[in-house]
Structure formats: structure tokens, C-alpha cells
Amino acid sequence: EVKAAAKAGNFNIDACQIIDPENYEGIDAMVAEMVKLRKGKMTDEQVRAALSKSNYFGTMLVKMGGADCLLGGATYSTADTVRPALQLIKTKPGNNIVSSCFILVRGDEKIAMGDCAINIDPSEDDLVEIAIESAKTAKIFGIDPKVAMLSYSTLGSGKGPSVTKVANATKKIKEAAPELAVEGEIQFDASVSPEVAEVKCPGSPVAGQANTFIFPDINAANIGYKIASRLGGYTAVGPVLQGLNAPINDLSRGCNAEEVYSMSIVTAALSVPEEETVDEEGLEAVVRAVVETMIAAKKLNK
């Protein structure tokens, strides 16, 4: 099917390796390794059945070094992309959760938002990880992160369990990553408007100029990035999954060809080992080219 589509579109894919899961020579070794990884939770038969699905097969291919990264989700839910990754790839040392971050672009402006896709009601400690990992993702996309821990309260102006959670998470972030510019808990208007910041949060190095926004839960985060995308004119790149031992990224089941293409490049760029990686300027150029392609495609589709 891939070769037929390439021929029909007059694309040269001679340099591409296409692996057919149904005729994969290393399937027996893959089954044995997955049985071992699942530690008795799955039989050989169950593992073979799982590996007949592209999400598990692709994840094991990454685990065994047959691929450097994985981009899925076009025909699977986010849960079906993340579950195999958690079971087989697992989180990086020091990370307890997988989270996600969207990069939103409008002209020369870039902002980051997390966690818009994975953690429904993150705890204080979850928010700490989400903020620190989202700041790292923001840097990859050429953003110097100024992190706003969003709430309906600014520095104690409101009360409630959510306010306490965000305020405590902010304190923990400052202890865990003292080099990171972070403010919270803070309302959105105070995080982006210098005039409002002067009234609500004077003297803050983040208030009024935040560019990395961490939401208290997935309701606020998912609604927030979609408002920015649909009404604010931003182009959304992501979600970029964070905290895993290998780059695994998720697409929306409503994705188009441009989004698949763009996220493929981003995912591949994230898979380059740190000691071999292009410099920050080079990586930013790659990402910028991807974003520009998405924006151009969006204008063309209009």
C-alpha cells in the first residue's frame, strides 16, 4: 500500500525502510522480549496478539532498537498510544509520569501549554514534573521558558483546593529547578498583560511576559489550547509527549497529512542522541521549518 501510494504520488522512497509486521523476521525475539518485559502478565499467545496491532509492534520496535522513535495515534486513541509506551518503554529515571505539551505558533510568537492531553487531574508533584518537562520542550522549540502556573487566583487572592495545589507545586518547582523562571499561582491575565501584572503581581520576573503555561487540570488545558488555536489564530504543534525513555508522540485521529508530516519531523529530531544532536540553532531551524510548513498548509486549506 505504501509503495503503491508513493508510486501514484510520484515520490521516491528508495531510502525508506518499510517493515511489514506480518512478515517481520524478528518477531520471535520480539515476543520473547515482550513476555520478559511484562513479567508474567501476558502469555506468548497474548503477546503475539498484541504485536499484531501496530501500536504494540511499533513500540517494541523502538524498545529493541529497530527504530529510534514512534509517531502514532492517527488510527488509535491517545490511551492506546501511551499504554504500550508506559508498559514497554517506561518513564525516564527521575520521572514518574508521562505528560504532554503543545507548542502554539502565531507569526513569530511561540508559546507552550501543558498538560493538554494526558493527565486528567494532576497532583502537586505531577504539576512539578509537567512544568519542568514542558520548559524543556519549550526550549527545544526555541522558547526561553517563563512558566506561569495558572489558577483562578493570583498569589493568594482566591482560596480552594486547586489554588493550594498550584501554589504548593510552584514552591516545589522553585526548589527542584531554581534556575527556572516560574510564577504561581497566577491568573492568566496577570501572566500575559504587563498592566495587569503590575497591579496583581508587581516585581515578578514572569508575570506579564509568560510564554509557558501550566494548567491545573486537563479540562482547563485542553479547552485553553483549543481556544488559542480556534479563536486566537495559533497553529498547534503536538502534543509532544514528555517523560518517556524514547520519543513517542501522539496524533489526533482527526489529523491531516500535513500534521503527520510535521510531527514526523519533530519526533525524528527529538530522537537524535544528545551527544550527536545538532546545535540548538540547527534544531530550532528544523522545528521552525516544520511550523512554517504547517502554517502554509493551513492557509492553503482555507
Regions found by a protein language model. Name each.
Residues E1-A207, N211-D279, L283-A297:
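Anion-binding alpha/beta catalytic cores of soluble intermediary-metabolism enzymes, centered on
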Residues K299-K302:
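Short acidic DE-rich linear segments
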